[in-house]
Structures are given as C-alpha cells and as structure tokens.
Amino acid sequence: MSAQNLSFVLQGIHQVKFEDRPIPELKDPHGVIVNVRFTGICGSDVHYWEHGSIGQFVVKDPMVLGHESSGVITKVGSAVTTLKVGDRVAMEPGIPCRRCEPCKAGKYNLCYEMAFAATPPYDGTLAKYYALPEDFCYKLPEQITLQEGALMEPLGVAVHIVRQAAVTPGQSVVVFGAGPVGLLCCAVARAFGASKIVAVDIQKPRLEFAKNYAATAIFEPAKVAAQENAARLIAENDLGPGADVAIDASGAEPSVHTGIHVLRTGGTYVQGGMGRSEMNFPIMAACTKELNVKGSFRYGSGDYKLAVELVASGRVNVKELITGVVKFEEAEQAFKEVKAGKGIKTLISGIEA
C-alpha cells in the first residue's frame, strides 16, 4: 500500500475504506509531524464503526479512525525544543484550546473546545502521518517499545481514573470490568500501593487474565440483586465494612449498583466506563453512606507523563495486554475481531516512512 498519507476512513456504518489524504502541514512553530507506527483499537472506535455515533458525537462526514497511537517524529516546527526528527513518541490525541476556564484550571480534559482524534468532526490517527503540538508527544525511553507506546493512551485513562479515586497505600479497590481499561486500573492501583484489588467481570477468560495480571482476587457476579452480589463480594474477599474504593470500567448498570453497595461508609466511587446515557442509580445508598461519587473522562495534566514513567520503571506492564498485531491493510478485519471480543488489545501496524 503505497501512498503519500494513506488513511483508514469511516464512510458510514460498517463502511470503511483506505484513502490517500494530504500530508498534514506544520501550521504552528511548536508543532511536529509524526509517522504513526502503531495504533490500538479502542471500544469507541468500534462503536463509531458499528453505530456511527456516540451520544452527541455523530459522524456526519468521512472520518479517519484511531486515537491510541505511537510513532516517530519526521518533522519539527521552528520553535520545537524538546523533540527532534527520529524521536519515538507516545501521542496524546486530544488538543485543548488552552484558554477556557477548565484549561486554565488545569483540567484540560474538560476543555470546551477540545479537538480529540477520531471524535467528530476531527480525524483520527490511523494514517501514515499525524500532526500534534510538541507538548502532546511524550518521548519514549529506550526500554519502552513503540508497541507499548501505543498503550500509553488507555493507561493514561486508567491513571486518571485511579487519581480521581485518590487511591493510597493499603486500601482495598474493587474494579468492575476486566477489559483493557479495567485491567490497567488494577495495575495502576497496585502501583499506587493498594493492598487488595478485586477484579469483577462476567467473562471467565478475562477474570483469569486479571488474576494473572494485576488483581489480587477475582469475582464473578451471579444473576442476583446487586446488594446480594456486593455482600458476597465483601465476605469472600474479607473487605470488612466494605471496600475503600470502587471503580466501574464497564458502564453496565448492574456493576454500577454493585459498586455503590460494595463500598464502606465514606468510600469513593469512580465511574470510568460509559454505558447507556441514562440509567437507574442507587442514590439512597450513596447518600446514607456519604460516598464520594466522581466521574472520570479521558486524561488530564500529568496523566500521560505518569503513564510513561510507570511503564519505564517496570511498575506497570502493558506488553502483556497486547494479544494481536495486524498489518495496516487488515485494519477492518481487526475491527471485526475486536467487536467479537477476541483478545485484550489489538494493534494495527502503521506505514513506515
């Protein structure tokens, strides 16, 4: 597949094609051009491919997919000082305005004018070349491969979730959903010093993976009331009056309910997974236990940097999550396999410059 800037473009629901797009130009002296080498497939990419929208974000025009990427710098702007041609980088795919109140408060993930890759109307990173500001590219140390570099994005999500939960050494943490983000939440919680980390899922293979990866225990919920599952979860894992922290990385309503009920009084609940836009919520339990209930969205200041440091130091292993790598021209087949639930994290190889 030879082209100037071959890109994997979503045309409509289940309609994708390879298209040669213009090579991006350096419009900012602080910008860089990256030759994208590896891109992970995220659930949001698959959702756009399957449904053409996620909530208010609707694909109206052809859009390049992908946002979990790593690559090699091929061009730098005149004012770039931290990177040079040939540097290997993890690519943070959301560029904030830097001017609005959330940005100025240090919460740029909540930017009112966020330009996020593969979120309409912005093109994603499944292309030969992609342009970014230099400060949204994180130089990879020698011990981190480009394949691992592509997982800094979901790891950044997990870092943000665990930071929202303010996990501290010795705490007990229950993580609902043993997909890539849930598994990485287990790993980050462990790196932060949590003593008990219980992974919860309804799929046995994922639970077994979690047990061998970063969870200290696993739990398969039964088809019973949330309070009953929570009581059994607490008893089987010796959580005393309840867990200190519950993280939902599934977006499933039964998990949300069980997560609230599994917590001790004054515990912390963080919603990291996105499910239906509206669902029932056990508000009485949240109030009477005076829980700290928080949302978590993407990643913010310092999250990507910490993600790289956690992998570089050996405290988090992302290599184990990579269960498949496909060629760029096989991208659509990879989407089908991810939709079918095969593997943990599939990467698409880029086109080397």
Curated annotation (Swiss-Prot):
Amino acids binding NAD(+): 177-182
Cofactor note (record): Binds 1 zinc ion per subunit.
Protein name in the entry: Probable D-xylulose reductase A
Binding site for Zn(2+): 42, 67-68
Pfam families found in the cross-reference section: ADH_N, ADH_zinc_N
UniProt pathway: Carbohydrate degradation; L-arabinose degradation via L-arabinitol; D-xylulose 5-phosphate from L-arabinose (fungal route): step 4/5
GO biological process: D-xylose metabolic process; L-arabinose catabolic process to xylulose 5-phosphate; sorbitol catabolic process
Family of the protein in this entry: Belongs to the zinc-containing alcohol dehydrogenase family.
